[in-house]
Each structure stands twice: as C-alpha cells, then as structure tokens.
A protein has these predicted regions:
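Short, extreme N-terminal segment that most often corresponds to the first beta-strand
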Residues: 1-14, 18
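Low-complexity intrinsically disordered segments
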Residues: 24-148
C-alpha cells in the first residue's frame, strides 16, 4: 500500500552494526514486519526471541531482539511503531527531525533492497547492501589490526 512502518533501535545503528544485521538476518518483509510490530528496541539480534529480563545480559541476550515494551515493560503507547503514508513522507520527516536522534535509518524496499538514510550528511543510498557489507568488512579489519 506504499506505507512505511518504522520502529526505533537504540544500539549499534551504524552500517557495520544494525545495517549488517539487517541485510544478513532481516532481509524479507516476512521476517522484518513482525519484529517492527513489537516496537522500539534496545537491540536486535538474529531472531525476535521470547520475553527476557531486559537488564540481564547473559546467554542468549545478544542473539535475540530486546524490546522496550515486551522486555522492560515500558508503556506500548511510548514504544509503538510509527507508520508513514509513503517513503517520501518518511524521508522528509526523518531528514528534518530525527525524532530520537537516530544516526541512520534503513528501509527494506518492496524489491528486497535496502535504502540507508544518514541525516547528518544528508546522504541517501539506495541499494545499500554492498556499501553496508563494505563498511562491516572495514570495521572488522580495524578490529583485527587493534587485536594484532
């Protein structure tokens, strides 16, 4: 129907973090829609998962999504997804406002590609998967150099 439904994600929103996770694990509407429907999240892993203790970061915590409403009990009204009537409206609002100070937005398009929006540089990358993967590889090289 042309609408865009979004939710806020707190941790690791940069391309080598959330961007890389999205292109690897959340790359179809069937996978991503139920995850977005649960609303704003502290962290996304490889699966939606079940309700967990928000403040206990033990085994499995980083493998699954951690939601503010489901897992921390915040009011749903404060953590619900937002639906925009079109991509154009979303882009305009996001680029102007960044409602929660987000650094990046990622949009799974109907053709299966991702668009990456970076408001601080006014950069919009359509078909962004290659650049997201390149950024993840660059970050891994930096980590490897630091560890050496």
């Amino acid at each position: 129907d042309g609408t865009i439904t979004t939710s806020y994600h707190h941790w690791d929103g940069y391309p080598a973090g959330l961007g890389f996770n999205l292109v690897n694990n959340w790359n179809t509407a069937e996978k991503i829609a139920p995850a977005i429907e649960l609303g704003d999240a502290s962290h996304w892993g490889e699966k939606i998962g079940d309700k967990i203790d928000f403040d206990v970061r033990g085994d499995g915590y980083y493998e699954q999504n951690v939601y503010y409403h489901r897992d921390r009990g915040e009011p749903r009204i404060n953590t619900s997804p937002i639906t925009y009537e079109s991509y154009a409206v979303f882009e305009k609002v996001f680029m102007r406002n960044q409602p929660c100070g987000e650094d990046y937005a990622y949009i799974l398009r109907q053709d299966g590609t991702f668009t990456q929006v970076h408001p601080y540089t006014n950069e919009i990358k359509h078909d962004a998967e290659d650049s997201i993967r390149a950024e993840a590889a660059r970050m891994q090289r930096l980590i490897d150099q630091e560890a050496a």
